[in-house]
Structure formats: C-alpha cells, structure tokens
Amino acid sequence: MKTIIEPFRIKSVEPIRLTSRPERERLARAAGYNLFGLHSDDVLIDLLTDSGTGAMSSLQWAAVMQGDESYAGSPSFFRFEAAVQNLMPFKHIIPTHQGRAAEAILFSIFGGKGRRIPSNTHFDTTRGNIEASGATGDDLVIAEGKDPQNLHPFKGNMDLARLEAYLEAHHAEVPLVMITITNNAGGGQPVSLANIRAVADLAHRYGKPFVIDGCRFAENAWFIKTREEGQADRSIPEIVRDCFAVADGMTMSAKKDAFGNIGGWLALNDDDLAEEARGHLIRTEGFPTYGGLAGRDLDALAQGLVEIVDEDYLRYRIRTHQYIVERLDAMGVPVVKPAGGHAVFIDARAWLSHIPPLEYPGQALAVALYEIAGVRSCEIGTAMFGRQPDGSEKPAAMDLVRLAFPRRTYTQSHADYIVEAFEELAATKDALRGYRIVKEPKLMRHFTCRFEKL
C-alpha cells in the first residue's frame, strides 16, 4: 500500500479547546508575543517542542504500575539501566530528571573559564550549560548544513577539516568533543555513521573524550539505514549500538527518543569521571539509582526504549514530516530540505525577506502562525542565538521556525490543517512586521523574553 498510516490505535483522548483569531491575538499580546508564555489550553496544535510532549503506550502505562519507589537500589533502576545498555554499551548509566541536568553535570566537570567545546551545532540548553560554566561552545557543522535548500543526505555532519584545524589551534582549551544526533538547531538533520566514527577518531587522536548528545538517536539511525551506503539491511538497534560504541559518553533527554514525559541520563565509561558525576548528581538530583526520577518513570522509559527502535513507527514518523515539507515546498514556502527527523523547519528569513534578521523574522512568523491558526511553534534563529557573550546582537546563521511534532500525538488531519494554515499565511505574509525585545534574561533569553511589534 502507498499510504503510510499511524501504526497505533488511540485508547485515550484529550479534547482540544477551539479558539477564535481575535482571542488568540489578545492572548499573544498578553504573553509579550513569546509563545512560551501561552497557556497550553489556548493552543490548538502544540508544536513548540517534541520534548516530553508525546503519548505513552499502553505497555508504558502498565510499566508505570510496577514502578518501585525505594530510595536506593530500586529494581526499576536496574530495569532502566539494562534497557539503556542494550542499545548504548556504556559502563556507567547515571539517571537525571531530564537532559539539561545531564549537561549541567557534564559541564560542571569539563567546563570552566577559557575552555572551548566543539560540536556540529550545540542546542540551546547545551550552549547555556556550557556558557554558565564559563566555557564557550563552537559549532562546526558542514557548510551544506547551513544551506536550507541543499539536499545533502547528512546535513548534520561535522566538518572534519575544520575540527582538525580547531583541535590543532585550541588543543589546550578543548576538554572534549561533542556531536548532536540529530542536529536539532540545524533543522533536525542527521549525522552519518561514517561521520560519527571519523569525529571519534579525530577526538581520540588528539586525546579528547568523545561525547554524543543522543536525544534523537533512533531517528538518526533511521536516516542512516535509509540513506547511508551499506546500512540498508541492518536493524535499527544494530546501527544505534555502532553509533555509541565509539563514544566515551553521552547525554540524553529521554523526553525525546525514549517516549518519556520526563527523564534523561548521563552515560560514561571512565570510572573516575563517573564517580565525580555521581557526586554532582547526589548534590543536585538525587541518589544514583533514581536521579530525580520516580521509579515508575524509570520503568516507563525502559519500555519506551524498546518501542522507539520499531521500524514501523520510525517510518511513519519520518514520512509525516516529509509529507508536510512536500506540501509546503509545492506552494512556495521555503523549507529546510530534506525533511528532518523530529520537525518541519521553515526558512523564515527567506519567506519574510522584508524583515531584517535583527527584527526577528522567525518570531514574526511563529506569532502569525499562532494568531491565524492556533498552531504554536518555536523560533530557532536570532531571537534564540543572536545575543553574543559581550551583549551585542548578531544575526544567527539561519532564522528558522520549527514545527516539532510530539510523538504518537497528532494525526493526518492535523498535518493537513497545518498545511492549510500556511496557505492562509501566504496571502498576508508581506504585511507582517518585525519585533524588538523589550525585556530579556541573561541566559537562554528566548524562554522568557518579551517582544513588541515594530
């Protein structure tokens, strides 16, 4: 059959409150035109993030009921640990309440003033934790990854020549090398297995640990299977194990590719580093066999790790994004191509070319999409990444709007509604105005800053 259906049945539903455009315009204004400030029950289709917003399966809910809440040595932890190590062969699995907590622990060890940490592209919380430690995060994605229209199959790849030159120039300041799979800030683009191995080889040649931000490891493995030469006949678990076999550690938000509503982990091979990390964990998160999570959460994540590598699910998920990208591209909306793993990315800078980057075209598009259709999205551009360490403002490499799809939550009719919203937007986009920021915090401003229309 040509039609790819949702490979699940719906057992429980949550009603969506329908709102009018005047109501949404009032709500956006009251939130300072920051969509993070909206109440979720004022949103029709919530594509702000795919993190922790998906639907758990009946087997995950069953696993919740066997959760053991012992403070230390819970069997829930050991089931969780075994599920992680089945896919990621690390010696030490350190649970955290979500991915940014794992990052905070990692950079409390490896960060510090004067240090520099390369990656393909650091996402917002990673960069925030790096900078909070006093270090600097540098992005070394390939040139194709900065071109929304380029059809390179692995636009998340790290530029190996730039990485080698970087390690030569900054050897003393670099405590580790990272890579993010998939590359969220670059359009949800995948990293090839060959590139992961080559980055690991370079890091180890220069005596640096190699750490993977693995939030969307299963989606990345699907792209490896379907796009990389020699991988088509291999299973998703086999590909996942190969990706992590060359790494010295990983950070993980289990709110993405573990079907969790909460949770994460830091994984390490080095005994001394793991001991130091557990010390930070006990001080900030909890005992090492729960790490800020309830036992029921650990059991739900263990089951989620079994389900996330199912090929029928991955085929459906990736095809959903491809469908929307194809429809938008056909109507002339500039989108990041090829379609990413967890989201559809709109090139707001290209579509709203009359709005300069320092007037936040991505924010203008995101607000308009909410006001017109009730769809909440997220700006990934100058509002998120434009402020420099010295307080100055610089345009980001791209101004994107991300439509991040919660897992197993929306259906085909929701996808068609989103396409229809862009059809309506196309008729009025040239009248949209830019924004200025009137209030912002020092770190990760996009979460809580307030805007005014120009």
Curated annotation (Swiss-Prot):
Q: Which UniProt keywords apply?
A: Lyase, Pyridoxal phosphate, Tryptophan catabolism
- For this protein, the Enzyme Commission number is 4.1.99.1
Pathway assigned to this chain's UniProt record: Amino-acid degradation; L-tryptophan degradation via pyruvate pathway; indole and pyruvate from L-tryptophan: step 1/1
Which InterPro entries does the record associate with it?
ArAA_b-elim_lyase/Thr_aldolase, Beta-eliminating_lyase, PyrdxlP-dep_Trfase, PyrdxlP-dep_Trfase_major, PyrdxlP-dep_Trfase_small, TNase, Tryptophanase_CS
The UniProt entry, under Pfam families, shows: Beta_elim_lyase (PF01212)
Q: Which cofactor does it need?
A: pyridoxal 5'-phosphate
Q: Where are the N6-(pyridoxal phosphate)lysine modifications?
A: K256
- Top-rank EC class of the record's enzyme: lyase
**What is a single molecular function from GO for this protein?**
tryptophanase activity
Quickly give the catalysed reaction: L-tryptophan + H2O = indole + pyruvate + NH4(+)
What family, per the record? Belongs to the beta-eliminating lyase family.
- Assembly state and interactors? Homotetramer.
- Protein name (record): Tryptophanase
Organism this protein belongs to: Rhodobacter capsulatus (Rhodopseudomonas capsulata)
